[in-house]
Amino acid sequence: MTFAATILTLYPEMFPGPLGVSLAGRALAEGKWSCDPVQIRDFATDRHRSVDDTPAGGGAGMVMRADVLARAVDHALETRPDSPLLAMTPRGAPLTQARVRQLAAGPGVTILCGRFEGIDERLFEARPIEPVSIGDYILSGGEMGALVLLDACIRLLPGVMGAPDSGDEESFESGLLEYPHYTRPAEWEGRTIPEVLRSGDHARIEAWRNAMAETDTRLRRPDLWERHEGARAQSPSGARRQKKER
């Protein structure tokens, strides 16, 4: 099954962009996924192909019009009714690895890329759109966010990564950051690879990696650590452990 990516955008020339090279590019050439950028202006009805207007209530910038976007969205929903419809916006829910896995397991995605000051809120009220954010910062438009989302999905498609399990231990897959990595040379600028990684003892190596993943997450991403600890406490084994400690 081909993972179908439809992107509603004012800049279709941005796609596939960087997704046309490396793993994603090879997967595109092999038909593992398809890229269909759709020009939003094609759904405008005036001779200027207008897609935006001044914000109600005043203020700076322009707002993307609900009527024009709705025609583009409806076209996408008719074309790919089984694909979830996402909108890249800083007002959306943070994109997580868990959500990426859900999307990658489906038939594809349709992504609406916002521009200017944002999208008329009535569009979200009238259409089944999932607002998604890739972080707490502002970009020039949703296209870069769409590329990020698609890359995260594409690399999880069957046959895209070299080893089938190469993504299983990456950051966020277990709710933690990934453990540190090392490779040759064994010594560099006076710094050596940790002895445990050169021991050949797989049980010790796994224990070290788990411990480092927990330590790094606790120090670098206390928000993730708190979430991880909360989930562990609610699990059956965690509940038994807490009861025993009491």
UniProtKB/Swiss-Prot annotation:
Residues 219-231 have a biased composition (Basic and acidic residues). The keyword Transferase applies. Homodimer. This is tRNA (guanine-N(1)-)-methyltransferase. One of its GO terms (molecular function) is tRNA (guanine(37)-N1)-methyltransferase activity. GO terms for cellular component: cytosol. S-adenosyl-L-methionine binds at residues 114, 134-139. It comes from the Bacteria. It catalyses: guanosine(37) in tRNA + S-adenosyl-L-methionine = N(1)-methylguanosine(37) in tRNA + S-adenosyl-L-homocysteine + H(+). The lineage of its organism: Bacteria, Pseudomonadati, Pseudomonadota, Alphaproteobacteria, Sphingomonadales. Keywords: Cytoplasm, Methyltransferase, S-adenosyl-L-methionine, Transferase, tRNA processing. NCBIfam families: PRK00026.1, trmD. Belongs to the RNA methyltransferase TrmD family. Specifically methylates guanosine-37 in various tRNAs. Gene3D superfamilies: 3.40.1280.10, tRNA(m1g37)methyltransferase, domain 2. It holds the Pfam family tRNA_m1G_MT. Its EC number is 2.1.1.228. It is found in: Cytoplasm. Residues 219-246 are annotated as: Disordered. One of its GO terms (biological process) is tRNA N1-guanine methylation. The keyword Mitochondrion does not apply.
